[in-house]
């Protein structure tokens, strides 16, 4: 009976170890994720250049979209991740002296990012927190001005349009994933991007702004 109990315990231990190894995130594996991401700009805008009402600024509203990532495990702890997604559409609103005018335009943007990540805890741990950092490329396009913008910048004239630049920035992140089984896992992360841009109006005025958004996302992932 005693020998049988010892043998049973050894078999159970081996089974648990095998299950843990099957669920491990180890060197050479590829992880893909699909989820929802919300970008919350933290705008600090310069004044719109003359001719304009002194103290005229802009703010940019939050936007959400589907996102996806592909991650390669370089070692059991270090990985590189490519992050992309569907375009985001942000409303641009007046701020400062023109805060009361409401929406003055809109802009679409995509911001693919490459992150070098470090994962904590053992490779076979059910939950693994991680940190990351890397470059972000932001492309702004499809920018439109509103009637309110024209009323402020070019009253009585043709509609005012907005032009935006393409910019590079840097992103840091903190997140974690929880393994459901040997392939599937859940993931959540918070990212902070440091980036600035310049908006130029068809009427000649311009403004520069630090966007520095926070992104919050949740996703489901699969390990190959």
Where are these regions (language model features)?
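Cleavable N-terminal export/targeting peptides
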Residues: 1-28
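Gram-negative (and chloroplast) outer-membrane scaffold detector with strong preference
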Residues: 29, 38-42, 69-148, 213-224
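Flexible, solvent-exposed loop segments that connect beta-strands
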Residues: 44-58, 88-109, 139-166, 197-210
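Membrane-spanning beta-strands of outer-membrane beta-barrel proteins
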Residues: 27-29, 63-64, 109-110, 167-169, ...
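Predominantly the C-terminal beta-signal and adjacent terminal strand-loop region
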Residues: 89-93, 181-224
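Short glycine/proline- and aromatic-enriched beta-strand/turn motifs that initiate or cap beta-hairpins
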Residues: 23-69, 221-223
């Amino acid at each position: 009976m005693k020998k049988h109990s010892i043998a049973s315990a050894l078999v159970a231990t081996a089974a648990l170890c095998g299950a843990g190894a099957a669920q491990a995130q180890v060197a050479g594996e590829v992880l893909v994720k699909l989820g929802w991401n919300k970008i919350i700009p933290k705008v600090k805008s310069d004044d719109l250049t003359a001719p304009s009402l002194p103290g005229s600024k802009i703010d940019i509203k939050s936007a959400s979209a589907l996102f996806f990532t592909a991650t390669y495990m370089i070692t059991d702890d270090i990985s590189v991740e490519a992050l992309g997604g569907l375009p985001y559409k942000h409303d641009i609103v007046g701020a400062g002296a023109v805060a009361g005018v409401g929406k003055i335009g809109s802009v679409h943007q995509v911001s693919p990012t490459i992150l070098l990540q470090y994962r904590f805890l053992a490779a076979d741990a059910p939950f693994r927190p991680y940190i990351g950092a890397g470059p972000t490329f932001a492309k702004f396009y499809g920018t439109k001005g509103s009637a309110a913008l024209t009323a402020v910048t070019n009253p009585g004239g043709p509609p005012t349009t907005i032009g935006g630049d393409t910019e590079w920035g840097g992103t840091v992140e903190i997140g974690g994933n929880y393994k459901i089984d040997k392939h599937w896992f859940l993931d959540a992360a918070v990212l902070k991007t440091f980036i600035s841009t310049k908006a130029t109006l068809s009427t000649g005025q311009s403004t520069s702004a630090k966007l520095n958004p926070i992104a919050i996302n949740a996703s489901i992932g699969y390990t190959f």
